[in-house]
Curated annotation (Swiss-Prot):
It is an enzyme of class 2 (transferase). Phosphorylation at Thr-269, Ser-338, Tyr-341, Thr-491 and Ser-494 results in its activation. Phosphorylation at Ser-29, Ser-43, Ser-289, Ser-296, Ser-301 and Ser-642 by MAPK1/ERK2 results in its inactivation. Phosphorylation at Ser-259 induces the interaction with YWHAZ and inactivates kinase activity. Dephosphorylation of Ser-259 by the SHOC2-MRAS-PP1c (SMP) complex consisting of SHOC2, GTP-bound M-Ras/MRAS and the catalytic subunit of protein phosphatase 1 (PPP1CA, PPP1CB or PPP1CC); this relieves inactivation and stimulates kinase activity. Methylated at Arg-563 in response to EGF treatment. This modification leads to destabilization of the protein, possibly through proteasomal degradation. Serine/threonine-protein kinase that acts as a regulatory link between the membrane-associated Ras GTPases and the MAPK/ERK cascade, and this critical regulatory link functions as a switch determining cell fate decisions including proliferation, differentiation, apoptosis, survival and oncogenic transformation. RAF1 activation initiates a mitogen-activated protein kinase (MAPK) cascade that comprises a sequential phosphorylation of the dual-specific MAPK kinases (MAP2K1/MEK1 and MAP2K2/MEK2) and the extracellular signal-regulated kinases (MAPK3/ERK1 and MAPK1/ERK2). This is RAF proto-oncogene serine/threonine-protein kinase. Its main location: cytoplasm. One of its GO terms (molecular function) is protein serine kinase activity. It catalyses: L-seryl-[protein] + ATP = O-phospho-L-seryl-[protein] + ADP + H(+); L-threonyl-[protein] + ATP = O-phospho-L-threonyl-[protein] + ADP + H(+). Residues 253-262 have a biased composition (Polar residues).
Amino acid sequence: MEHIQGAWKTISNGFGFKDTVFDGTSCISPTIVQQFGYQRRASDDGKLTDPSKTSNTIRVFLPNKQRTVVNVRNGMSLHDCLMKALKVRGLQPECCAVFRLLHEHKGKKARLDWNTDAASLIGEELQVDFLDHVPLTTHNFARKTFLKLAFCDICQKFLLNGFRCQTCGYKFHEHCSTKVPTMCVDWSNIRQLLLFPNSTVGDGGVPALPSLTMRRMRESVSRIPPGSQHRYSTPHAFTFSASSPSSEGSLSQRQRSTSTPNVHMVSATLPVDSRMIEDAIRSHSESGSPSALSSSPNNLSPTGWSQPKTPAPAQRERAPGSSTQEKNKIRPRGQRDSSYYWEIEASEVMLSTRIGSGSFGTVYKGKWHGDVAVKILKVVDPTPEQFQAFRNEVAVLRKTRHVNILLFMGYMTKDNLAIVTQWCEGSSLYKHLHVQETKFQMFQLIDIARQTAQGMDYLHAKNIIHRDMKSNNIFLHEGLTVKIGDFGLATVKSRWSGSQQVEQPTGSILWMAPEVIRMQDNNPFSFQSDVYSYGIVLYELMTGELPYSHINNRDQIIFMVGRGYASPDLSKLYKNCPKAMKRLVADCVKKVKEERPLFPQILSSIELLQHSLPKINRSASEPSLHRAAHTEDINACTLTTSPRLPVF
């Protein structure tokens, strides 16, 4: 017993185990001696013994309410001790900060350097927190039925009913919820980190970010390393508990059945993929010379991350006993500009033959998931104002869906601005009327006029002014289906003086309205100017000729039409042209734009005209053999005796 009391006195004084305690010839077994360090016996000063003081360990509180105990060896730094514990959780020391908890000052902590000798911290309690500039995001799970073919990102099996994160797109079965990575990659913040590796700190601690074109953005985003299984998955996935106490606070989601796990409650606040952060930090450290670049700090947080809708968050304190309201708070996901998804890489489109060129660009036939038409616009070195105006118009064009409108498929910005539309196998109306001289029936001409008016009525309902309406931009697709192309794009069809858009008469003069030629208004293009151009198209349909064919001087046409001295000769209309169509042509080409009808009225007039045309209705009775061309060659006996032929 004397040996036991001596050993215990040594332990309680804080000097640790001595070799004589284990090497002695005492009858006490080593197992019993090792258990003395865990006995709760007070020392002479009345304090309890800390078991970590008696061994080379450090207790560490990690993010997300996790903790661990690490062993310390001589010569190891904090970075070496905590590397493994952080790696298995998908963390990087470069993204975190380590603190020593000051128990003598409750709630306070002192930051430590990662190169600190770990041996000097034996028995202490440490805490690891995220750095403020690391983009954090939480999963936003929602139950979803996948109507299209989908597979679970965890087990790679077919997925019909499951869950999907609305932020990162991770999808999984219900029984795979415990294997979902806790890291939700916020790609809007990752793109900011990769776009601005050379950002410098400006006034007020806000990084000054350079202005980029879409081409540089596309090249920057292409540096994102691909994931292993899922495009948003992280390589450091680990399992976590799928249960959460009800006292943690309720989310702003509907209450789900208690028989299924509420996977939305398993949201974890962790940084993005460690490999992406590592690459971004490496590229940031390799880029040397800082340069002061101009940027608007209104939309930036103190760490430089774009936050268009939410204010900059306050500095986070992640003490072990902190409240969980902030952790359960749903973070709004960053919204990407939807026009981003309509941009096509120039390397994906293969141009083949040159179809033709016009006032605003050159059209090529190309291949992009099938035959497409690529119109390379005549815009050299677009200014930022032109580029933004072009993107704004593309945002309008991509919403057009109509049977009589060419389908907009995307746009390109590399090297040149270009528009990609569907390919029409047929020829343009101009080629049919004036080159091939196709002979159409009157009801066919009226139907072409109706479809054209129907497509223009749709464009005007979308507040899109064509600005270049003519027979060259009307295509007959698969028979007599009208497709209107080359609409909108006021950015390309206007002249720019510096950063200001200046209107000028561009396009084909034969289809120009008089007010457009005169250019007395700042913006002469209107719905009525499109109606005048449509009236010239009607004139082409009903005469088979171009207007002013007797005038060979272009400047003379501009002068006479602009002054109101010349107008299309309506006496050349076909003799079998209905009177209603003649009146419509005359109304559309009136010199005063306020007197011209709009397309809803035009479409209604043509539809009434179509209904009034005489039609030969086909008989609904059964076919008769008497209508055969050579009924005398049919053997009546064969008809009555052959079992294979029907008898009428």
